[in-house]
Amino acid sequence: MESSLYKKTSGKARRALRVRKALKGCSLKPRLSVVKTNKHVYVQLIDDVEGKTLASISTLAKVAKTSGLTRKNQDNAKALGIKIAELGKGLQVDRVVFDRGAHKYHGVVAMVADGAREGGLQF
């Protein structure tokens, strides 16, 4: 008999794998990955060919803390999207592949995407 926690975590891993198997990021068009926990949001630009993270920001980062973006809500998620777009522009990245992970494109995840679009990234 499987525990309910095992079902939940394995289902989440399967959903994330299903989304990620269709996505591939490179240095010219990296993967914009959004990870959401109960308290925080993490956003990364990832080059899958090299296996490297090009840029990252979260609600735990010093830049976010000085800006007052320490909580997981939609306003802060949009601001994180704008900031990751600025970091991407510094790396000459203007196109990305959006990776929502195991989460629905809704709420905080959608606001990160909207903020990144506002900041100048194209999906």
From Swiss-Prot:
Family matches, as InterPro entries: Ribosomal_uL18_bac-type (IPR004389), Ribosomal_uL18_bac/euk (IPR005484)
Biological process annotations from GO: translation
Family that this chain belongs to: Belongs to the universal ribosomal protein uL18 family.
Gene3D superfamilies: 3.30.420.100
Domain of life from the UniProt record: Bacteria
Descriptive protein name: Large ribosomal subunit protein uL18
Keyword Ribosomal protein: yes
Annotated Pfam families: Ribosomal_L18p
